[in-house]
Amino acid sequence: MEFTGQIPPYSINRPLSESEYNYQLKQKDKLETELYHQLSVIEINSNWLEIVDKYFFDKGAITFSIGILLCGMLTLTIMILFVGVEQIYKNNYEALIVFLPLLITLPSITYFCKQIKKEINYTHYPIRFNRKTRMVHVFHHDGTVLSVKWDKVFFTQIPVTYGMWDTVGHILDEDGVTVRETFGLPTCGLGREGREVGKGYWEFIRRYMEEGPAGVVDVISGCLPIKDKKETLAFSFERIAAALGSYLNPFILIFYIFYPGRMIAMHFSKIPQWPADIEAQCQRVEGHDPFFRDASMNP
């Protein structure tokens, strides 16, 4: 689980680093690597491809972890108030000192509530690649949409935490050097092997945009059923098992621990809706589209 870009945010308003130049992924350069779709596709058709954000797969971990902390802090706060008020009622005003921990707990509770709101907001933050208009549309956490030309995005791989690597798109200033905004693709891997998987995912996106859907559609084993509804608990279990290769994978227990938080975050989050002007730009092919896939066609 890795949350760079959400907590903490990506570093922006800075020049590109030497490492980012070295690991740049260019739109016109084909990579001879295995393609990966990372179970991230919501819909693909002849005109556009829609995927989830980087944080979708780990959604709920922040809610669960911070929820546990909040329960502890709220319990401590109530105990402090109870003891303090009881002592004041007994005219023991020296007991006012017990309220000092509230100077830490109350601001901490406020801070953690703000962090939870980063998850309990939208169910996911879709990214749409329109190969006809050659535009990329990124749904922001505040409900606004970033629209940028495909050829203007500086794609690269960056090291984040615990030896992991993100595959990201940088929006550069007019000088072509200063990073103004960054969005992450839904692939984050550990070490060199993880970086290679990230390249395979990038090539999946790049090949769709540059060569069309024919070369990538057969790679997709299934689509996420979240286009117009919230993820169910049953599908969530199936998705994790598919990602790990088996229900018997011991790492699946780690994800199960956070599932109460995921269900809470999903239940109280809104389903994202693209603005009308974006939908108008992203028309599907009339009639039969041999490259159309969504969750209704899952095996």
Where are these regions (language model features)?
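Juxtamembrane cytosolic face of transmembrane helices
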Residues: 116, 122-123, 153-171
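Short, non-transmembrane cytosolic segments of multipass membrane proteins
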Residues: 1-43
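A membrane-cytosol interface segment of integral membrane proteins
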Residues: 163-228
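Short, hydrophobic/proline-enriched secondary-structure or compact coil segments at domain edges
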Residues: 41-59, 165-168
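Short, mixed charged/polar active-site loops
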Residues: 126, 143-148, 177-182
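N-terminal topogenic membrane-targeting module
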Residues: 122-142
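Alpha-helical transmembrane spans
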Residues: 52-124, 233-299
